[in-house]
């Protein structure tokens, strides 16, 4: 939704961009610690992984607090309205300090299901204990990379505390968008435009401008792709506070952001996506039944569209790229066959840099290592296509061949029957 609000184009003319495999997403407590290092106001809090740690934190960190906020830590939104598989309702609770241990016991080690986790949910390994702040106003603030303006874009709204989708629908006139010149950086005028648009009720204007500038500094210096604060709150002591934040980082910057990338929690990520990343494959899991292996992101998207056109649903986006090795093809098949939802696999290769014979050899080797229990539909075209077809034919494998993409998609859908 942020991308739609930014009204960004699909590409930046004349600029080559390395394909981004994944974006690092960190937990709320990690984001709060990072923002605090940049002088950004955040609630006092501590992450704990056991009931003993909860008890100690209440005694040491919140000795004079009558109430605290207990937040389950999963890499997904919608925690407050989520449901644990043990029946406990809500992943965020404001409780009496002496009740924190009991509430945490219902969260730690349990699976939380939200609108963003899917039915499988995510395991809560830590909870974040925060001070309960006295808020007088809630707003929305984010910074994203906007391809339309070829730079960072600040999106803000006077209303906050709910999803940006709802805010944009209910309060379109309150949405503020301020593009920032990536070469000049954020100016006092830029930050003032954001603050004046938000029209804080009690927070000091000059202090608020400095907070916006610090948020922008963090965004740039840590190679963020998205920084979202919802709510950006005003407190009764006239401060602007990042009450809840999400930060994503560009994987291409991992080599120079080693400290941040050491925060990656692979246990919260799709294991198939983790395996794909290790093999330098671009994979995104979906909910369909037809596994896809394609070279090139554009062709992969087109393949998924054609599958939908013929009444099927893709199980994934999987781009093996233009220089895939046999080993990567084998790994791709392992990832596809590990998905129990997959009832058929469609391989769609247009060989340019990628050679069809390499793909064919990879398919044959994969069949030897992985028990293929589902139909495999193969469409090959381009470089070394005849050699590739010969390798498949001589392998003795029971493959379904297709002449073109439309034919391949139609056969994949029929194979489900």
UniProtKB/Swiss-Prot annotation:
Residues noted as binding substrate in the record, renumbered to the chain: 295, 352-354
Annotated compartments: Mitochondrion
First-listed, main subcellular location of the protein, grouped into a coarse class: mitochondrion
Binding-site residues, Mg(2+): 230, 244
Cofactor note as given: Binds 1 Mg(2+) ion per subunit.
Keywords in alphabetical order: ATP-binding, Ligase, Magnesium, Metal-binding, Mitochondrion, Nucleotide-binding, Transit peptide, Tricarboxylic acid cycle
GO CC list: mitochondrion; succinate-CoA ligase complex
Annotated organelle transit peptide span: 1-24
Database matches in Pfam families: ATP-grasp_2, Ligase_CoA
Tissues where the protein occurs: Expressed in roots, stems, flowers, leaves and fruits.
Pathway: Carbohydrate metabolism; tricarboxylic acid cycle; succinate from succinyl-CoA (ligase route): step 1/1
Cofactor: Mg(2+)
Domain ATP-grasp: 32-275
Enzyme Commission code: 6.2.1.5
Catalysed transformations (reactions): succinate + ATP + CoA = succinyl-CoA + ADP + phosphate
Chain positions recorded as ATP binding sites: 71, 78-80, 138
UniProt GO molecular function: ATP binding; magnesium ion binding; succinate-CoA ligase (ADP-forming) activity
GO biological process: succinate metabolic process; succinyl-CoA metabolic process; tricarboxylic acid cycle
Subunit field text: Heterodimer of an alpha and a beta subunit.
Family, per entry: Belongs to the succinate/malate CoA ligase beta subunit family.
Known function: Succinyl-CoA synthetase functions in the citric acid cycle (TCA), coupling the hydrolysis of succinyl-CoA to the synthesis of ATP and thus represents the only step of substrate-level phosphorylation in the TCA. The beta subunit provides nucleotide specificity of the enzyme and binds the substrate succinate, while the binding sites for coenzyme A and phosphate are found in the alpha subunit.
Annotated protein name in UniProt: Succinate--CoA ligase [ADP-forming] subunit beta, mitochondrial
Organism for this UniProt entry: Solanum lycopersicum (Tomato)
Lineage: Eukaryota, Viridiplantae, Streptophyta, Embryophyta, Tracheophyta
């Amino acid at each position: 939704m942020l991308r739609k609000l930014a009204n960004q184009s699909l590409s930046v003319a004349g600029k080559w961009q390395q394909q981004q495999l994944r974006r690092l997403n960190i937990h709320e407590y990690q984001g709060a610690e990072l923002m605090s290092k940049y002088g950004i106001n955040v609630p006092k809090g501590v992450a704990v992984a056991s009931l003993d740690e909860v008890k100690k934190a209440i005694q040491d960190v919140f000795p004079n607090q009558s109430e605290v906020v207990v937040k389950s830590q999963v890499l997904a939104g919608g925690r407050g309205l989520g449901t644990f598989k043990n029946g406990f309702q809500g992943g965020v609770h404001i409780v009496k300090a002496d009740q924190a241990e009991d509430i945490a016991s219902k969260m730690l080690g349990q699976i939380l299901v939200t609108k963003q986790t899917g039915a499988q949910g995510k395991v809560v390994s830590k909870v974040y204990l925060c001070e309960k702040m006295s808020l007088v106003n809630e707003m929305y603030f984010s910074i994203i990379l906007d391809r339309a303006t070829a730079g960072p874009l600040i999106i803000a709204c006077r209303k906050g505390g709910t999803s940006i989708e709802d805010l944009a629908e209910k309060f379109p006139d309150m949405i503020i968008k301020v593009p920032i010149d990536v070469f000049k950086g954020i100016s006092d005028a830029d930050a003032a435009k954001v603050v004046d648009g938000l029209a804080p009720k009690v927070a000091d204007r000059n202090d608020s401008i400095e907070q916006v500038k610090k948020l922008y500094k963090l965004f740039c210096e840590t190679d963020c792709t998205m920084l979202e604060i919802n709510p950006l709150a005003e407190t009764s002591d006239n401060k602007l506070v990042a009450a809840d934040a999400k930060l994503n980082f560009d994987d291409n910057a991992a080599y120079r952001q080693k400290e941040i990338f050491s925060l990656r929690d692979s246990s919260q990520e799709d294991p198939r996506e983790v395996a794909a990343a290790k093999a330098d494959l671009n994979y995104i899991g979906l909910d369909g039944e037809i596994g896809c292996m394609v070279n090139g992101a554009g062709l992969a998207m087109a393949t998924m569209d054609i599958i939908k056109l013929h009444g099927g649903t893709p199980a994934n986006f999987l781009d093996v790229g233009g220089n895939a090795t046999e080993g990567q093809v084998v790994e791709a098949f392992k990832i596809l066959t590990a998905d129990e939802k997959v009832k058929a696999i469609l391989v769609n290769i247009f060989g340019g840099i990628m050679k069809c014979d390499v793909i064919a050899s990879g398919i044959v080797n994969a069949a030897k290592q992985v028990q293929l229990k589902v139909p495999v539909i193969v469409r090959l075209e381009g470089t070394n296509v005849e050699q590739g077809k010969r390798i498949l034919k001589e392998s003795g494998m029971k493959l379904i061949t297709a002449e073109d993409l439309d034919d391949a998609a139609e056969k994949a859908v029929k194979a489900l029957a």
